[in-house]
Amino acid sequence: MTELLSSIEMNLLPVNCKFSEEQKEVIYENNSIDVVAGPGTGKTTVLTARIKMLFEEVNGSRKGICVLTHTNVAVDEIKSGLRKLGIDEIKRPHFIGTIQDFFNTFFAKKAFHLLLKDKKMRVVDDDIFREKFHKVFNLRKPGFYREDRSLPNPENKKIEWNFNDTQQFASVVGIKNPQYKKAFDGSINFLFSKGIITNKCCLELSNWYIERYKEVFRAVIPRRFSHLLLDEAQDTSVLQFNLISALFDDEKVTIQKFGDPYQAIYNIWGGDTDLAWEIDDSKERRISQTSRFGEPIVNIVKNVCIKTYEDLTSNSKHESFPPYFIIYDNGDDLLSKYSSLIEELESTNESFKLSQKLKVIASVRHKDLEDTFGDKYKRENMKKLTRNSYLDLFLSVLLKKLSKKFDEDFEDNLKKFQNRMQIFEIIKALIEDENEKLKDGLRTLLDELVTNEEFSVDKDGLCTEIIESLKITFSLELESQSSESEEYEYSNIKLCTVHSTKGETHKATLLMLDTTFTPDYRKDSLSYHIVELLKNCFHDEYVELPEKKNEKEIESEKARKLAYVALSRPTHLVCIGIPNNQIENEPTLIQDLLDTGWKQYTDQDVI
């Protein structure tokens, strides 16, 4: 085992680096545990090392390891680490994938076909489902439904599923008008009968199917998997945990959960903000030494955490600066000051200057960034277009157009190698403006994809519609890439939401404090500015939130969770940006910050 660990360290860690004692304790642990890993403590690296250890342990047996996480990016990161350790392909009996893919593939599909036999199941994004729902609801809506009234959003309604009732699988909760409810229920059930469902529905199907054959699965699963490793456990929903508990008998399968409970931000806008991950104190293991940032940032992160985090310490080689705050008038002023601060600090610190990591301004909502930076902030145009992103862009346009017109599932065919090669030829013709080649290539591809008779009636019309949409989408992307440096003087600073920074490491991060929190979005609700909600976190002493919280304290907890994620991203420089118009509301704030070690940057000198 010692030799294996040395080999893992050599291939997975930076030169001359070793796993810490608390990391090794987790890597070697063979019992069920809850691993609480702080920001920058090497959670994914430890998880990858643990997987390698287990693969070696079960080699030659018929049992596999099941690894579940929440995003394809996380899956790719784990697989990339395993390739460094000589594992190029994940084969049965092992499984590494997203939790949603696991339930969709092994349970939801089987449940669906049990109910609707050979009907094709199509799992669509929420926005596509909403469009299809609107089209169906529009035909069924009651006579009193005004034309100028917006159509309902199915994502915002609670739907009860009863797959034992073959007459009506779905029933919306909370709609009292019987005609409205009939139209809503009828629309959802019609789409289900056509095989058009969402990921949320897949979990409900899985739940029904697992309950139906629970004892069989609990007997079979331990024969297939010896271990379940659950990554990002803090983002796992109550229903997902219930499904895992129903499937995996924890007396026969070792279950090891990894995550940071303080980074649970995906559910903060919903009604249920409680953490679904119930950490067992007797099984808890902590990885609390961060190598991402130094003690100045550690102290900031500890102070915004929703719970006391005394054991978070730094063993980082990075020399983190003291925290800075910037008072700004508008977006240009903030960009100018932040950019100047970075330049000044780069002139004093070689490691900061040489770092190629991101420089970021993050805010809670897209709208905050749009209001502050205007056209400089483009939600979709912050990434460089690569060969793969060209492909993603093309597939996004094509699938949306086809999904609106036909009920077929095109994704599997589009994954075929020969179709991918065709698509790259079409993209090339699109970029080089070779219209005839573009049209011929698209017609050939559509002939292979679409079997619906309606297609032959208006083939040219559909081709023209898709080409127009492709040209608009690609021209916007290409234009944004070519002109971004001209429009945006500080193009090396990324503008984004806090949610999109999760999992990233930056050289410098500024959290823009210009968001208003309104509980439940009720018209009569009081609103709380983020500066008001976080000001207690800028004191020397940690201020704990009470167990029973009033409305303002609930919003403060949300703000702290978001600040914790944002302010734990950088290696060297952490900042906050405060709008000038908030200073008069908080007259002591500047002095409070200065008294607790924050430095103010005014773009003339460092105070």
Regions found by a protein language model. Name each.
Residues 1-607:
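The feature marks helicase ATPase cores and/or their adjacent C-terminal helical subdomains
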